[in-house]
Amino acid sequence: MYCLQWLLPVLLIPKPLNPALWFSHSMFMGFYLLSFLLERKPCTICALVFLGALFLICYSCWGNCFLYHCSASELPEAAHDPAVVGT
């Protein structure tokens, strides 16, 4: 389970508030995970635990999934602030 210490913090990286940056963020995270899995080759148990956690986070649609934005979840309140979106 040593390899999980490099995978689990990835789930804690927040999604950007600006909706225009969601695609770039999801591409970066996807390429990071792919390169990590190819380079470090974590054990099967660690990979399954991480993919299970990622599936549960994305399936719950709490807005924490970095792969896509759930249509049922609302935007954060700060996303409607022009000072935040304009940055």
Curated annotation (Swiss-Prot):
Subcellular location: Cytoplasm; Nucleus; Membrane
Domain of life: Eukaryota
Segments traversing the membrane: 19-39, 43-63
InterPro entries assigned to the protein according to its UniProt record, in alphabetical order: BCALP
Keyword Nucleus: yes
Keyword annotations from UniProtKB, A to Z: Cytoplasm, Membrane, Nucleus, Transmembrane, Transmembrane helix, Tumor suppressor
GO cellular component: cytoplasm; membrane; nucleus
Listed Pfam families: BC10
Its membrane topology: Multi-pass membrane protein
PANTHER family: BLADDER CANCER 10 KD PROTEIN HOMOLOG, BLADDER CANCER-ASSOCIATED PROTEIN
Function of the protein: Acts as a tumor suppressor; induces growth arrest at G(1)/S checkpoint and apoptosis via RB1-dependent and p53/TP53- and NF-kappa-B-independent mechanisms. Modulates expression of genes involved in the regulation of proliferation, cell cycle and apoptosis.
Similarity comment: family membership: Belongs to the BLCAP family.
Protein name stated in the entry: Apoptosis inducing factor BLCAP A
Biological classification of the source: Eukaryota, Metazoa, Chordata, Craniata, Vertebrata
Name of the coding gene: blcap-a
